[in-house]
UniProtKB/Swiss-Prot annotation:
One of its GO terms (cellular component) is glycine cleavage complex. Keywords: Lipoyl. The modification N6-lipoyllysine is found at K63. This is Glycine cleavage system H protein. PROSITE patterns: BIOTINYL_LIPOYL, LIPOYL. It comes from the Bacteria. Binds 1 lipoyl cofactor covalently. Belongs to the GcvH family. Pfam families: GCV_H. The glycine cleavage system is composed of four proteins: P, T, L and H. The keyword Lipid metabolism does not apply. The keyword Zinc does not apply.
Length: 127
């Protein structure tokens, strides 16, 4: 699967899509592939504040439990409730159906510090 050019990426394999003064966050195709079949996703509540580089949830696969690290700071304004009943969406549609949270940014400049698709591809040895 190709790496979408319209997103930014963290070194912890989260993607970020800018929508006005907010961002949508999910995990990358590379990350879901490393984790294997996702069986449970734990996400914060709407209204929670998340801090960049701090855990904001977790993803449980048949192999392991992995924490999700916030690529930016802000207030959670939406959570993808579908992942509660359909965690497999993370494997099936990491960039579309499996978005995890929408966050109102506290510092928009944090997005610019994230990796471009090209840099993320280099980091993960993907073309």
């Amino acid at each position: 699967m190709s790496i979408p050019n319209n997103l930014r990426y963290s070194e912890e394999h989260e993607w970020v899509k800018t929508e006005g003064n907010a961002v949508v966050i999910g995990i990358t195709h590379f990350a879901q592939g490393e984790l294997g079949d996702i069986v449970f996703v734990e996400l914060p509540e709407v209204g929670a504040t998340i801090q960049a580089d701090e855990p904001f949830g977790s993803v449980e696969s048949v192999k392991t439990v992995s924490e999700l690290y916030a690529p930016v700071s802000g207030k959670v304004v939406a959570v993808n409730e579908e992942l509660s009943d359909q965690p497999e969406l993370v494997n099936e549609s990491p960039y579309e159906g499996a978005w995890m949270v929408k966050v109102e940014l506290s510092d928009a400049s944090q997005v610019e510090k994230l990796l471009t698709a090209e840099k993320y591809a280099e980091m993960t040895n993907q073309d």
